[in-house]
Structure formats: C-alpha cells, structure tokens
Amino acid sequence: MDTAPASPEPFLVTPQAEVLEELIQAQMGPLPRLAAICRLKRLPSGGYSTTDDLHLVLERRRVANAKERERIKNLNRGFAKLKALVPFLPQSRKPSKVDILKGATEYIQILGCVLEEAKVSEKQSPEEQTHSGRPSDPHVSSTRELLGNATQPTSCASGLKKEEEGPWAYAGHSEPLYSYHQSTVPETRSYFTH
C-alpha cells in the first residue's frame, strides 16, 4: 500500500489585474476626458474641433498667470504700505491682512472724531476754549493724545476695547485684537405725541 502524502491545497490563481477605468467603461460606456482649455468650432458633422493652437493656449495661460502674480504682488505691496501707516497694530506678532484693515478702519474713525472735535472747538468762542482748559490748537493735542496713548479715552472715543471674549476673539493668536467703539449714544426721537 503505497500511500502518497496528501497534497497541499492548491494555491488560488490570482486573477488578472483589473483597472477601474476599464470596469467603469464596460458598465457605463466611454468616460469623459479632460481637455485643454481652448476655443472650439462646431463642425457640420456635429462634432467640435479646436480653433486654437495648443502653444497659443499655453502662452495665454502663462500670460494670465503672470498677470495674476503681479496683481497679488501689488496687493501685498499695498498692504505693506498701509501697515506702515497704521499705528494701532499688534506689535507682538505679524498682523494679518484682516488686522491691518481693522486697524486702518479704527484709525480713520479716530481721525474723523478728531476732525469733529476740531470743528466743534472752532465754533466755540475763545472764552469757552480757555475755560475748558484746552490748548489753542485742540485738534493737534487730541491727535497727539490718541497717537501717544491709544488706550486713553477722549471725549469722542471711549478708548480701544478688547473684542468680546470667546474662541473666535483672538483669531488663533494669543494677543487680542482691538476695536474702536464710540461712546456717543445715537439720538432717538419720539414720533408719537401724548
């Protein structure tokens, strides 16, 4: 009795590699293809053919990309100039573009308040100005006050206040952003008479 050793289980044959594209094409039909961006001309047969040379299309893309890069550089140069002019920016970190715009807005509002104070003080008589203790050139001193110590309140501004607390308050930074708040209350009129 010759017993042959039991043969091990045969290995499974590995199926041929299948490409997903081929499977989808078999089920769905031809797949859409990515095409270069170019102008197409409709043919009498209903198909389309390109009217542009591929080199011209690529050259137009290069020109458009160069224009966009130059536009972004100009924008960044403008922000750099604005950053140099605005005094109310955080010094402990590099301010973002949003910080620069907020600081510029606050600065413009404060300068507007200084101009309003100057107009009001010009309308006052010289006696009232000396009694109020203001110097002869009030808008210059107000500007110096605001620029010298931004947290010192004036008659037009209640100072710079921290934005409301919360996870969004510091925009991912450890230093708070500051915003300008006017202390004047808007006038309300009653349209009903009793």
UniProtKB/Swiss-Prot annotation:
Mostly located where? nucleus
The consequence of inactivating this gene is: Females display a defect in the formation of primordial follicles leading to infertility. Although embryonic gonadogenesis appeared normal, primordial follicles were not formed at birth, and massive depletion of oocytes resulted in shrunken ovaries and female sterility. Null females do not express ZP1, ZP2 or ZP3. Since its expression is oocyte-specific in females, Figla is a plausible candidate gene for primary ovarian failure in otherwise phenotypically normal women. The gene for Figla null males have normal fertility.
Skewed-composition ranges (Basic and acidic residues): 121-137
Q: Which GO terms describe its biological process?
A: oogenesis; positive regulation of transcription by RNA polymerase II
Q: Does the keyword DNA-binding apply?
A: yes
Subcellular localization, per the record?
Nucleus
**CDD domains on file:** bHLH_TS_FIGLA
Every bHLH domain range: 59-111
One Pfam family here: HLH
Which residue ranges does the record annotate as region Disordered?
121-163
The family database entries (SUPFAM superfamilies) matched by this protein are listed as: HLH, helix-loop-helix DNA-binding domain (SSF47459)
Q: Which GO terms describe its cellular component?
A: nucleus; transcription regulator complex
Keywords of this entry: Developmental protein, Differentiation, DNA-binding, Nucleus, Oogenesis, Transcription, Transcription regulation
Q: Which InterPro entries match?
A: bHLH_dom, E-box_TF_Regulators, HLH_DNA-bd_sf
Task: Fetch the SMART domains from UniProt.
Answer: HLH
Instruction: Enumerate the GO terms in the molecular function aspect.
Output: bHLH transcription factor binding; DNA-binding transcription activator activity, RNA polymerase II-specific; E-box binding; protein dimerization activity; RNA polymerase II cis-regulatory region sequence-specific DNA binding
Q: In which tissues is it expressed?
A: Expressed only in the oocytes within the ovary and at lower level in the testis. Found in the resting oocytes of the primordial follicle cells, at the periphery of the ovary and in the hilar region. Also detected in growing oocytes, but at lower levels.
Describe the subunit structure: Heterodimer with TCF3/isoform E12.
Q: What does this protein do?
A: Germ-line specific transcription factor implicated in postnatal oocyte-specific gene expression. Plays a key regulatory role in the expression of multiple oocyte-specific genes, including those that initiate folliculogenesis and those that encode the zona pellucida (ZP1, ZP2 and ZP3) required for fertilization and early embryonic survival. Essential for oocytes to survive and form primordial follicles. The persistence of FIGLA in adult females suggests that it may regulate additional pathways that are essential for normal ovarian development.
- The name this protein carries in UniProt is Factor in the germline alpha
Gene source species = Mus musculus (Mouse)
